[in-house]
Amino acid sequence: MKVSTLIIVSIPIVSGLQIKDTVGTTTENTFWYQLFGTPSRSQPAAVAATAAGTEVQGFTPISTSSSSSSSSAAPWYQGLFGVGRTTLGQVTTPSRTSTTTTTSNPIAPTTSIANSNNLFGTDTAPTTTTTTNARSRSRSTPVTVSGDNVLTLFGNPNLSTGNDQSNSVSKTTAETTTTSSAPSSSSRVQPTVINGGGSDGVLTLFGNSEALSNFDSTTVVDSDSTARITPIASASASSGSSTKDNDSDSSSARGIKSIPNSSEFLASLINGLGSGGGGNGSGSNTNSYKNHSTTSTTSKYFNSSSTATKLSSSKSIYSNSTTSRSSLSVSSSSTDGGGGANLFGSLLNSVAAVSRTLAAESTLSTGTTTTSDSANSNTKDYSSYSGTITSFPSTTGSLSGDGNKLIGGNKYLISFMWTNLILTMIMLFT
């Protein structure tokens, strides 16, 4: 009895699934959707991307790009149980936001003016030509401090502050080529100590072959490496390279002398290796560029070249960015006559030492990359919805087609189906 009654009652219920407004419409317009409420759907948001770039000579382009996408769909249960009453069957809603920002400060060109030495007393202003090319790039690499010109005991190491690939280092490279010319004038570029291996040399405890080179050059400054001087031409000798003084016709070397491999650092400190030919043999070279500065100090008594470079790194755990700053302090002394060419004489004659502090602290380039992914969820927050379904959708206008229409006499069919549902529930639980 119950089975037969169930079959009879279920016939109009099942047939109600086929009732549509018009023939060929989607299931959104079926009888059940109109009976319990039409669900709402939201289409996936379109992906938006913007990019802007401006390139000016001496400046680095600034680019910004962003993209976002989202998708959501309301379940049909929303219409069945009322808005905000269930989260069953919710479609997964992924969301992704990506923002990339790269900003670089303009790079000022470097100008080198030649020394004017006119024999007849009519000095002519020198001619200076400066060419600056700047480029910026951001990448995720460990922060590495070059070991060039570092005073160590046994060699020339490369010092690394870590191998954390999460460090985001913004690197800006500036290439500057300077050409100077003037009547009866000379242009002098401070040299770089070069050892026998061809790389930047260091003064070790147990001896190191060093040479002095002075020539026209192209200077390349890197934000996270020591300033280098790339030679164009040089004359080499057996124990190093021989350099001609630009200020005279003398062939004697000025500044750093070549230390043979048989000599040791301690011997040069105690005995001293005097410099022949003009001047006090002391010189200081400062290469300062934005947030990185390198200073080389030379002395004829110590036969050494020292570089003061300080690099500090600050990393943010949230924005994954790194800001590099550097500062340096330079102390130079002048020794004219007396005291002998040794360590003690140099100390006695360095009373008139000049101490200066140069600070170059500025954020050269900052790169920030932020990416967020929301976890896939099978639920949806309906807290923003309010109210319940209070009325059924109504049909307006004229309808055509062979399908049954939910107007006029069909309202009695709806009442009949509700009655059958109630009777079925009573029969099942009695």
Curated annotation (Swiss-Prot):
Query: One of this protein's GO BP terms?
Result: cell adhesion
Q: What induces it?
A: Induced upon high iron conditions.
Question: Where are the GPI-anchor amidated glycine lipid anchors?
Answer: 401
* Principal location listed in the UniProt entry: membrane
Q: How does it sit in the membrane?
A: Lipid-anchor; GPI-anchor
Biased segments, Low complexity type = 92-112, 122-135, 168-187, 233-253, 314-335
In which compartments does the protein localize? Cell membrane
Mention any one GO cellular component term assigned to this protein in its UniProt record: plasma membrane
Residue segments, region Disordered: 88-195, 232-257, 278-302, 314-336
* Propeptide boundaries: 402-430
The record's keywords, sorted A to Z, are: Cell adhesion, Cell membrane, Glycoprotein, GPI-anchor, Lipoprotein, Membrane, Signal, Virulence
Polar residues compositional bias, start-end: 141-167, 289-302
Q: What is the residue range of the signal peptide feature? A: 1-16
Q: Which domain of life is it from?
A: Eukaryota
Q: Does the keyword Membrane apply?
A: yes
Q: What does this protein do?
A: Putative adhesin which is involved in cell adhesion and virulence.
Protein's recorded name: Probable GPI-anchored adhesin-like protein PGA32
Source lineage: Eukaryota, Fungi, Dikarya, Ascomycota, Saccharomycotina
Gene name in the database record: PGA32
